Regions:
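Conserved N-terminal catalytic core of the sugar/cofactor nucleotidyltransferase
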Residues: 1-68, 72-79, 187, 229, ...
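Hydrophobic packing residues within well-ordered alpha-helices of enzyme cores
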Residues: 23-27, 145, 194, 243
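Residue-level signal for inorganic ion chemistry
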Residues: 55, 70, 107, 113, ...
């Protein structure tokens, strides 16, 4: 849904050999979301930056957005950021304040807002701004990833990719404001926090968070017929009932 809301419709999903068919069965080829989905496999864990090597042919000469599957963004106005990034040479990363920056990639700034440092999970962070799992790059990211050395953790680090763009003075950063909610749902505790927030927010607003059919419908990529089909497929669930209500007000 996050990608669709940014206007991105050509999407590659990278998963393990054991799970890729689960995603394919769940999401299909993407037409019911007004998108085209491609499925790629990661043979073994090799770091976030390995994604660019796996999808090098998918990227081709295009700009690319990389979104980590356990990152949840709410109220971020990412469509505006995506539009700017797509027209910009180099790379765009986000920055958000966090209480435990040592667990993430950390970015620090000068008083003028220029990037001062980029570090991967530092023991003594220079700032409380961390880099969440949503990145925008031009097509040269594939070449940058190909030249990366394997880190001490045995991985191709995304922070090293960003370092290369920064050294070439082609790295841009957008600090997310206080109205933004971001969750890293990579642990049971963090997943619980995210689920609790989403539940409360949905009860308050009456709107689902993470409904790709709704995002596609509001973009004009699918019509009433596709919405009706998805509602029928999920008619016995709360999700299906939500789509039916959406159709009634469409």
């Amino acid at each position: 849904t996050t990608l669709l809301e940014m206007g991105i419709r050509d999407i590659a999903i990278i998963a393990t050999e054991k799970t890729v068919d689960i995603y394919r069965k769940l999401l299909g080829e993407g037409s019911r979301f007004g998108a085209a989905l491609t499925y790629l496999t990661q043979p073994e864990p090799g770091g976030v930056a390995q994604a660019f090597l796996i999808e090098r042919h998918f990227i081709g000469e295009d700009h690319v957005c990389l979104l980590l599957g356990d990152n949840i963004f709410i109220n971020t106005h990412l469509d505006l950021i995506s539009s700017v990034a797509a027209a910009t040479e180099g790379a765009y990363i986000l920055a958000v304040r966090h209480g435990k920056p040592e667990q993430y990639g950390v970015v620090s700034f000068t008083r003028g807002g220029r990037i001062l440092s980029l570090e991967e999970k530092p023991q003594k962070p220079r700032s409380r701004y961390i880099v969440p799992g949503l990145y925008f790059y031009d097509a040269s990211v594939v070449g940058a990833a190909e030249k990366l050395p394997v880190s001490a953790r045995g991985e191709l680090e995304i922070t090293d990719v960003n370092q290369r763009y920064w050294q070439d003075e082609k790295l841009h950063v957008f600090r997310l404001g206080r109205g933004t909610r971001w969750f890293d749902a990579g642990s049971p505790e963090d997943l619980f926090k995210a689920a609790r927030y989403v539940r409360n927010r949905q009860k308050q607003t009456g709107k689902l968070i993470g409904c790709p059919e709704e995002a596609a419908y509001r973009k004009g990529w699918i019509g009433w017929r596709e919405l009706e089909w998805s509602a029928g497929q999920n008619r016995h669930s709360l999700y299906g009932k939500y789509l039916i209500r959406l159709m009634e007000y469409a």
